[in-house]
A protein has these predicted regions:
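N-terminal beta-strand-loop-alpha-helix module at the start
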Residues: 1-73
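Surface-exposed, flexible loop/turn segments at secondary-structure boundaries
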Residues: 13, 36, 76, 106, ...
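Catalytic cores of large soluble enzymes that bind and process phosphate-bearing ligands
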Residues: 46-49, 53, 78, 104, ...
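Well-ordered alpha-helical segments embedded in enzymatic catalytic cores
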Residues: 53-56, 81-85
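Short strand-loop junctions, especially beta-strand C-caps/beta-turns
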Residues: 73-74, 103
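Acidic-and-aromatic substrate-binding clefts and catalytic sites of carbohydrate-active enzymes
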Residues: 74-80
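Beta-rich, aromatic/charged-enriched effector core domains that present basic-aromatic interfaces
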Residues: 83-164
Length: 164
């Protein structure tokens, strides 16, 4: 099944399980977008550093024989909008399945949830694998408890991960 996988600019993890195997059926995508540079004022050096890291990571992915589509800020196909870029690639490459890693930013999380609901193809989310905890660990830990003391959560995490 032809799959499109989105990599966001803060998910540059070459050790992610996605990259353990190469497949002709998987296409990765990354986008430099005005949507991300303009929603909050950023120093130009921060934006340049962010895009430089993304470009370097994209070269690593290609060097490891993964298919990747990368839209630079001035790419003629870049719609400057995440949903529009994804929709373009889904149509252009006859994608049957879409996957993405859970974003750390609420705004992007909501945008991707809405986008996936609008799709006529299947979709799936993955953990970013760069944190000790998963998205719902804190909520699950405190479920049914009357006291919400972070120290107890941290102690539990240290035991689980054998730290200290």
């Amino acid at each position: 099944m032809k799959t499109l996988r989105l990599i966001l600019g803060d998910q540059l993890n070459s050790k992610h399980s996605w990259f353990k195997e190469q497949s002709e059926e998987v296409i990765y995508c990354m986008f430099e977008m005005r949507q991300e540079t303009d929603h909050v004022t950023h120093h130009i050096q921060k934006i340049i550093g962010f895009f430089a890291a993304m470009r370097d990571f994209s070269e690593q992915i290609k060097a490891n024989n993964h298919k990747l589509i990368y839209f630079t800020l001035d790419d003629k196909n870049n719609k400057q909008d995440l949903a529009e870029n994804l929709q373009f690639l889904i149509k252009e490459h006859k994608i049957k399945h879409f996957e993405y890693q859970l974003p750390d930013e609420y705004r992007l999380d909501q945008q991707l949830i809405k986008f996936c609901k609008s799709l006529e193809i299947s979709s799936k989310t993955y953990d970013t694998e760069h944190f000790y905890t998963k998205r719902n660990d804190l909520k699950d830990f405190f479920k049914g408890k009357k006291q919400f003391l972070m120290e107890s959560f941290y102690r539990d995490m240290r035991k689980k991960h054998d730290i200290l």
